[in-house]
From Swiss-Prot:
Catalyzes the specific phosphorylation of arginine residues in a large number of proteins. Is part of the bacterial stress response system. Protein arginine phosphorylation has a physiologically important role and is involved in the regulation of many critical cellular processes, such as protein homeostasis, motility, competence, and stringent and stress responses, by regulating gene expression and protein activity. GO terms for molecular function: ATP binding; creatine kinase activity; protein kinase activity. NCBIfam families: PRK01059.1-4, PRK01059.1-5. A motif (RDXXRA motif of the pArg binding pocket involved in allosteric regulation) lies at residues 338-343. The gene is mcsB. This is Protein-arginine kinase. ATP binds at residues 27-31, 92, 126, 177-181, 208-213. InterPro entries: Arg_Kinase (IPR023660), ATP-guanido_PTrfase (IPR000749), ATP-guanido_PTrfase_AS (IPR022415), ATP-guanido_PTrfase_cat (IPR022414), Gln_synth/guanido_kin_cat_dom (IPR014746). PANTHER family: ARGININE KINASE 1-RELATED, ARGININE OR CREATINE KINASE. SUPFAM superfamilies: Glutamine synthetase/guanido kinase. Belongs to the ATP:guanido phosphotransferase family. GO terms for cellular component: extracellular space.
Length: 362
């Protein structure tokens, strides 16, 4: 497979499209946890019940068309290769738990990959909407519309006092998790992030790494989400999160301005050194690649680097993960082989940008 063909089929819309404040906010996600009456929760149900739930969603929703997102395809975890499941995790379309610990798990995936509905994860279903930039309100609107569409066909486990019933008590109520992924290199470089994260936690929000709980903030990418689901409306939860995110955006922009004023030539040097590493390396580990990509993205946003899309960070942070590298290679790779393949893929992607720039100048 040629790189361009691989790239065009691998990239989801949230990676390649721009959204509001997408210089700092990479994506917005809304996730709704729901369970169906007359079935035990996934934490205690048996294999027969698990299969019945998958069959119910396969018969009712697979290949159905939904406006703006296209048709849904059902992917059964038992029918996917380990690399295929890993790619879905790396694209943020399913959770590691569904990929690794749910033999009767499945996922309904929309054509544009903005919508994924996980089946038999921690709850019977988890509806996820993933949009580029800061679009929490828009993602919530689509998630609620999908939620209503599904509820026309199934009965949810719901309590008048508590709200939606979920396997984990922390999700009871709205059953909603709202989150954003943010690129905050200037707050990291100025070390302001060390005081900001505890302050955010005190507001009932959680700050995690790129792939959620327990993951590292590779490439200065942080995931910020709500913790409280009970006693607040979905709209209030989203507005509270948006308010904090908008403050973070302002602080990151101020920190960038400070860096440009005080360390302009050193910052420019850092950006171009990182670009040189990405453009010329023959071997590169994931952590170094993530840091260099973060530097280059910052350089693009500050105008140091021209004619390269800022979405290159979104794309390459995903495409250089182990699952994608092995899918591109067409087989399992040892860690040292992945480092070679990662360097080659990054060089190819940068060459694509150079060709686009040259064609644009003609």
């Amino acid at each position: 497979m040629s790189f361009e063909k691989f790239f065009n089929t691998a990239v989801s819309s949230w990676m390649s499209q721009e959204g509001p404040d997408s210089d700092i906010v990479l994506s917005s996600r809304i996730r709704l946890a729901r369970n169906i009456v007359d079935f035990q929760f996934p934490t205690v149900f048996n294999n027969e019940e698990a299969q019945q739930i998958v069959s119910l969603f396969e018969q009712t929703f697979a290949h159905r068309f939904y406006p703006s997102v296209g048709r849904f395809e059902l992917l059964k975890m038992s029918e996917l290769q380990p690399i295929e499941k890993r790619v879905l995790v790396e694209k943020h379309l399913i959770s590691p738990h569904l990929a690794e610990d749910s033999p009767f798990g499945a996922c309904l995936l929309s054509e544009n990959e903005e919508i994924s509905i996980m089946i038999n994860e921690e709850d019977h279903i988890r509806i996820q909407c993933l949009f580029p930039g800061l679009q929490l309100t828009e993602a919530l609107k689509v998630a609620n519309e999908l939620d209503d569409w599904i509820e026309e066909h199934v009965n949810y486990a719901f309590d008048e006092k508590l709200g939606y019933l979920t396997s984990c008590p922390t999700n009871v109520g709205t059953g909603m998790r709202a989150s954003v992924m943010m690129h905050l290199p200037a707050l990291v470089l100025t070390q302001q992030i060390n005081r900001i994260i505890p302050a955010i936690n005190q507001l009932g929000l959680v700050v995690r790494g790129t792939y959620g709980e327990g993951s590292e903030a590779l490439g200065n990418i942080f995931q910020i989400s709500n913790q409280i689901t009970l006693g607040k409306s979905e709209e209030d939860i989203v507005e509270d999160l948006k308010s904090v995110v908008q403050q973070l955006i302002a602080q990151e922009r101020m920190a960038r301005e400070t860096l440009v004023k005080t360390l302009n030539i050193q910052l420019e040097d850092r950006v171009f050194r990182s670009y040189g590493i990405l453009a010329n390396s023959r071997v590169i580990e994931s952590k170094e690649a993530a840091q260099c990509l973060s530097d280059v993205r910052l350089g693009i946003d500050l105008g140091y680097i021209k004619n390269i899309s800022r979405n290159i960070l979104n794309e390459l942070m995903i495409l250089t993960q182990p699952g994608f590298l092995q899918q591109y290679a067409g087989g399992v790779l040892r860690p040292e082989e992945r480092d070679v393949r990662r360097a080659a893929l990054i060089r190819e992607r940068l060459k694509m940008e150079e060709r686009k720039a040259m064609e644009g100048d003609e």
